[in-house]
Amino acid sequence: MKKRVLSVLFCAAITSVLLFGCGGSSDDSTGDSGTGESTAADGNAEAGGGTYALITKASGNPYNEKEAAGFEEAVAELGGTAIVKHPEKATAEDQITMINELVAQGVDSIAIAGNDFDALQPALTAAMEKGIKVSSVDSNVNTDSRQTFVNQAGNNEIGQTLMDAVLDISGGEGQWAILSATSQAANQNAWIESMKTVMEDDKYADLELVEVAYGDDEYQKSVDQTQALLQKYPDLKVICAPTTVGIMAAAKVLQDEGLSGTVKLTGLGLPSEMADYIGDDDDHSCPYMYLWNPIDVGYLSAYTSAALVSGDITGAVDETFPAGKLGEYTITEANDGGTEVIVGPPFKFDSGNIDEWKDVY
């Protein structure tokens, strides 16, 4: 993949926000399925139109809304029609219903953040048999269910980054826990497995992973799971939440219960939601966290879909394609034997830069 320096990514993020603001996607939900459909403005992209669909994990998640905003921005540049669907719940069943609806509509492509690695295969393979181009984005599906995967960052890189954060924040020893999304979420599961692999190194020997809890990417359930962890493990030192919903819920619990100086927090979070909780003192629970720009993830997903539809790529290793303001990307081999396009490395947010980014996304 062509390397891009952080300053380029940051300029892209700022440009995205200037175009779309810091809110969610611009579509209005209609119907029981939560479909948002918008017709993009005329553009000068070689794809020359097309209908591009995005199915996110679930509704009510600001991360998903910003990802959808980036998707719609790119489709507008491509001169096509964007259809965004947000399932009511983060389940494979809700997504299967939406896939079938999109197949019936005759869309040109479907990009999906999978709620289950394998359960979507019958519906997605049926879509591909109809000539619809299918890619996964943000959360993967199996290799038979996609042509390529738009990945935020490499799984091993995320696992190493988060594990090193736990090691640093804990002082190198003690109990820690993970607060994840759903137990079927392919992306979180891959990151957690990578963290466990990293933990096999001797330098992590004094750290004890006591539990992986699941908040299902629902705020209240994530609050409940955080409270349960605190009750079950009074000696807990660190919670790592590789989910934007989970980290925000955990931060609120630690603040409300006066535990910000006792139990520390790290993971993946949105700067706009976590700014009040990031700091180096006992009044702040999160010394630092990581993420990428979800607007860029959605933006790259749309350009990937367009390249598949136009035939510029098939999803094979070493194919390259332009992705608007983000530049050129190269398809690489994924850990599961399929292929992927990686947006870029995770970025660290701490007390020194959070004010700079909290108004961006």
Q: Model-predicted segments: where are they?
A:
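Bacterial N-terminal signal peptides that target proteins for export
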Residues: 1-9
